[in-house]
Structure formats: structure tokens, C-alpha cells
């Protein structure tokens, strides 16, 4: 059933002159989202990737920076001090970067000085122990999505792009769905409905009964 809706959302949505994302809207029910412990806040690695380039920034010592060949941006501890004095520039960077990674010894300083900017955006850095190679973590982040409900019963999660194959989108959908269901007290019973759409297209309801067997 899910495969049918993925195919339909492509066929029924007019192609645009830019790379459209495909996202799902998840509507919860019977969940007390006023309790932060009940909220969905997941970072999920998509098995088929995002279908587009994501930007990852690394804040670390020079030693770690040299190992992270796949980081899109690299910053030093001194750069953190500069950002403290120029928060406007850092806000622009935070909006442009999808994920931050930081050497664990810098996390306290980053949280204290830049947490007010990164926290609300859900972009608190992922810590890496000193001396460790962050390459694999960065690679996974480039294939990851965030699923965050906050205190709202409806939230949205991208599962790829229109140019991806139906099979790749299906695999990504199943991964996101199963992770979210695993975090709900009643599992599928806490899902009211799920819709899928392209960036500019109309939403189509997804039937997930075959995933709950």
C-alpha cells in the first residue's frame, strides 16, 4: 500500500523546475505532548540517503579537522569566540548548516555561548571524543533526518527527493515509520494518519496497515 502512494504522489504532482523534496506528515493521537518525555525527537539515518547534499559543520582542534575530509565547514575553538561576538553571522551559518559536529571538549563552551542559537533549531552538535575520526559520523549525518514533534500533534519529516526511485523512498519511509512507532506507548495506535507529498504537490493519505503485521 505504501508503495502505491509513493508512486501516486509522483504521478499526480506536476514536476517543478527545482529538486522537490518528498515528505510525510505524521498526525498523532492520544499522546500527551505537554510532557516532553512523550514528544518525538529522533535523528534517523535513512538507508537510501536524502537524495541531496546536506551540509555538516565540524568544530574541533586542528588534529581532528585534518581527519574530517567530508565536513563541509570546519571551525576552530577560536572561531567559537568570534561567533560569540558576531551572533548575527552565526545565525546565518546555523540556518545554512544541517548538522553540527564538535570535539567533546568544546561542547561546554559551545552550549554556553551558542546554545541559545543552536538549541531552538535542533542543531546542538554531536560530540566526538578527542582523537577520534569523525568521518563515519559525518557520513551518517549526511543521510539523516530529524523527526521532531515538539508540542504539536502534527509534524513533518523529509524522506528523500522526487528524483529518487520508488524503492529507495519506500525503504526510507519504512525506516522513519518504524522508528517513530517504536517511540510511542501504543505503537501504531498512537498514529492518527500519515500523508505524503512533494514540496509543491497535494498530499495523499498513506495506508500503513501492511507495515503493522
Curated annotation (Swiss-Prot):
Quaternary structure and partners: Part of the 50S ribosomal subunit.
A single MF term (Gene Ontology): rRNA binding
Gene3D superfamilies (UniProt xref): 3.30.190.20, 3.40.50.790
UniProt signal peptide: none
The protein's name in its UniProt record: Large ribosomal subunit protein uL1
Organism: Picrophilus torridus (strain ATCC 700027 / DSM 9790 / JCM 10055 / NBRC 100828 / KAW 2/3)
Keywords: Repressor, Ribonucleoprotein, Ribosomal protein, RNA-binding, rRNA-binding, Translation regulation, tRNA-binding
Pfam families in the record: Ribosomal_L1 (PF00687)
Keyword rRNA-binding among record annotations: yes
Domain of life: Archaea
InterPro entries, A to Z: Ribosomal_uL1, Ribosomal_uL1-like, Ribosomal_uL1/biogenesis, Ribosomal_uL1_3-a/b-sand, Ribosomal_uL1_arc, Ribosomal_uL1_CS
UniProt family annotation: Belongs to the universal ribosomal protein uL1 family.
Organism placement in taxonomy: Archaea, Methanobacteriati, Thermoplasmatota, Thermoplasmata, Thermoplasmatales
PANTHER family: 54S RIBOSOMAL PROTEIN L1, MITOCHONDRIAL (PTHR36427), LARGE RIBOSOMAL SUBUNIT PROTEIN UL1M (PTHR36427:SF3)
GO BP field: regulation of translation; translation
GO cellular component: large ribosomal subunit
Chain's role: Binds directly to 23S rRNA. Probably involved in E site tRNA release. Protein L1 is also a translational repressor protein, it controls the translation of its operon by binding to its mRNA.
Amino acid at each position: 500500500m505504501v508503495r502505491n502512494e509513493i508512486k501516486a504522489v509522483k504521478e499526480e504532482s506536476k514536476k517543478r523546475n527545482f529538486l522537490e523534496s518528498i515528505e510525510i506528515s505524521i498526525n498523532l493521537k492520544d499522546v500527551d505532548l505537554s510532557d516532553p518525555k512523550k514528544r518525538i525527537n529522533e535523528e534517523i539515518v535513512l538507508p537510501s540517503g536524502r537524495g541531496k547534499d546536506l551540509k555538516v559543520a565540524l568544530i574541533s582542534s586542528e588534529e581532528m579537522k585534518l581527519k574530517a575530509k567530508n565536513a563541509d565547514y570546519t571551525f576552530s575553538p577560536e572561531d567559537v569566540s568570534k561567533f560569540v561576538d558576531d551572533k548575527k553571522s552565526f545565525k546565518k551559518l546555523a540556518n545554512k548548516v544541517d548538522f553540527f559536529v564538535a570535539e567533546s571538549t568544546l561542547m561546554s563552551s559551545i552550549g554556553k555561548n551558542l546554545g541559545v542559537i543552536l538549541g531552538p533549531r535542533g542543531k546542538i552538535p554531536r560530540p566526538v571524543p578527542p582523537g577520534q575520526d569523525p568521518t563515519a559520523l559525518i557520513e551518517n549525518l549526511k543521510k539523516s533526518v530529524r523527526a521532531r514533534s515538539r508540542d504539536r500533534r502534527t509534524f513533518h519529516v523529509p524522506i528523500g527527493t522526487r528524483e529518487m526511485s520508488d524503492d529507495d523512498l519506500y525503504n526510507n519511509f519504512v525506516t522513519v515509520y518504524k522508528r517513530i512507532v517504536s517511540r510511542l506507548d501504543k505503537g501504531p495506535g498512537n498514529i492518527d494518519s500519515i500523508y505524503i507529498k512533494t514540496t509543491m504537490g497535494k498530499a495523499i493519505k498513506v495506508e500503513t496497515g501492511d507495515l503493522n503485521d
